[in-house]
Amino acid sequence: YVTQTTLSVDDTKNIVDALKIKFPEIKEPVKEDICYATTNRQAAVKNIAKNCEMFFVIGSRNSSNSQRLVEVAKQSGCNRSELIHSESDLPIEKIINCKTIGISSGASAPEVLVKNFINKIKEKINLEIEEVEIIKENIIFKTPGKLN
């Protein structure tokens, strides 16, 4: 079997478990075929969202990965989870009275978008930031020149 690289890790596990029951001799991939960034972000969102009043995923509206992160946040207990494209989409009126807001980004969203989003929130409300590292990622990609 093969899986889509941006599927929900939990959904994929459920499907694979069902396949193994129905087809005990099924051949598995040699290695994990869900990308590391997807797996890591889903684990982080799952850990953080359960403690948030509101959760934002920064990413493209047509990004399967970003959409899955919103689903994971909701499944983890934060029903007020939204996908936003950039800081200009920030619904200030929704966060004014929130005590805890979670933020993550899709695997392909540049870090500068996350920083811009946080800066936009800082302009509107007093903010204490706590970075939560669930899994250390050692891979670094160069930011495209247009985004610097």
Question: How should these model regions be labeled?
Answer:
Residues 88-96:
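Helix-loop module immediately N-terminal to the HCX5R catalytic loop
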Residues 5-23:
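Glycine-rich phosphate/diphosphate-binding loop of Rossmann-like nucleotide-binding domains
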Residues 21-54, 59-61, 67-76, 80-87, ...:
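Active-site rim loops that border cofactor/substrate pockets in soluble metabolic enzymes
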Residues 2-8, 104-107:
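Active-site donor-nucleotide binding/catalytic segment of nucleotide-sugar enzymes
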Residues 12, 66-67:
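Glycine/threonine-rich flexible loop motifs
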